[in-house]
Amino acid sequence: MGLWGGRFINESNKLFKEFNRSLSFDYILAEEDVISSVAWSKILMKSKIITEKEQITIESALFELLKEIKENNQKILKSKCEDIHSWIEEKLIQKIGILGKKLHTGRSRNDQITTDLKLWCRKKIHLLLENIIELQKTFILSAESNHNIIMPGYTHLQRAQPITFSYWCLAYVEMFRRDFSRLKDVLKRLNVSPLGSAALSGTAWKINREELALSMGFDSATNNALDTVSDRDYVVELLSSASISMMHLSRFSEDIIFFNSGEADFIELSDTITSGSSLMPQKKNPDALELIRAKCGRVHGSLISILVILKSLPLSYNKDMQEDKEGLFDSIKTWNDCLCMAILVLKNMQIKNESCRKAAEEGYSNATEIADYLVKKGIAFREAHNISGQLVLRAISEKKSLNELKLSVFQMYSNLIKNDIYKNITLESCLEKRMSKGGVAPSQVYEEIIKAKKRLNIF
């Protein structure tokens, strides 16, 4: 059934009809369309546009339809309807006859679709927030159970300074904490109701939009109908949040892929989250992580797409905005899938203590400690930095670690260096001295774990 056509003489071209249809993807909004339609029927009754008996009949039929949708929403795709709105209306009319044609009074598909989309986004945001919390919890528990593992920290993918695996975990807790905060902000701005804005200038019927908004769980109604039906900022914001979080997931994946490689050998991934090679029997591939890394680009592409779609669009609604959904639907599913997979990976990997420590010991990651030691002896940092660099060069030439150099060698570069140099350049000393807020000192890390557990209600 078409929702328009009275002013047309000729029927739409078959190819155009197919090109114009959105049911193949907006069928996902079926439940939301029913929910908003029920709310609309109630406000029509309160405005005395339909009777109480008519409203009860409409609501009953819509909930009956909702039950059918939940049982199998794929059957919607067999229809030739233009979109989900026309499909719902067609089914409603089939159930209750001409009364079903009253439901669209005072409503436009322009405010209807953005209401449905906001309801869908809100539902998905709550699910995403839960999984972001779960991912943070998994990092915290991993940090707590591997608190004593020392490993190299990297800059430019070269060993820089010693850190702990717990500290590495906490870095990602901070990233996903920001993701959580961003997503909550999206929800705050998204949660205003468009319904009742009609096509672009509001409705001529006496509708209490604030009451309507509250009935659907919105905080309030929007303030300007022209802006309301034009607005897809919430889609941009949601995809922006998704893109940033996916970037964090991609960085996490790259770290683990490297840690799992034969070159690092810091961790062992479980058989349950890896795959093999059809040719090379020795291979154990981190496919889950590689897919997360790749899917990041897919989500970023959807963000760019919606920005380009909305660029230069005149007010108010334009058919271009039909293209806001496929990328959004795909990206939100992708983001959620990747969050779940990251949780699974973290729960199914073993940290190799000895390999991590060996790498930290071999990379001259304690060189900064020599410079700091000399500064405490009264040497300017730039000069101390130079002396430390010369000692690293000497150690490399002798194929030794800094700890293995003789005191006499140290004193060739500065007579201020005494026997206490050795206790100052142990890995443990490197960690313990970094007591500044956010530092790697075990006591600081432990304190942050306790704070995070309290914040996330981990008992």
Swiss-Prot record:
GO cellular component terms listed in the entry, alphabetical order: cytosol
Keyword presence, Cell inner membrane: no
Domain of life: Bacteria
GO MF terms held by the record: argininosuccinate lyase activity
HAMAP family for this protein: Arg_succ_lyase
Family: Belongs to the lyase 1 family. Argininosuccinate lyase subfamily.
A matching Pfam family: ASL_C2
Protein name: Argininosuccinate lyase
PROSITE patterns per record: FUMARATE_LYASES
Pathway listed: Amino-acid biosynthesis; L-arginine biosynthesis; L-arginine from L-ornithine and carbamoyl phosphate: step 3/3
Source species: Buchnera aphidicola subsp. Acyrthosiphon pisum (strain APS)
Keyword terms: Amino-acid biosynthesis, Arginine biosynthesis, Cytoplasm, Lyase
Compartment(s) where it occurs, according to its Swiss-Prot or TrEMBL record: Cytoplasm
Reactions that this protein is recorded to catalyse: 2-(N(omega)-L-arginino)succinate = fumarate + L-arginine
Any single biological process term in GO: L-arginine biosynthetic process
InterPro entries for the chain: Arg_succ_lyase_C (IPR029419), Argininosuccinate_lyase (IPR009049), Fumarase/histidase_N (IPR024083), Fumarate_lyase_CS (IPR020557), Fumarate_lyase_fam (IPR000362), Fumarate_lyase_N (IPR022761), L-Aspartase-like (IPR008948)
Documented EC number(s): 4.3.2.1
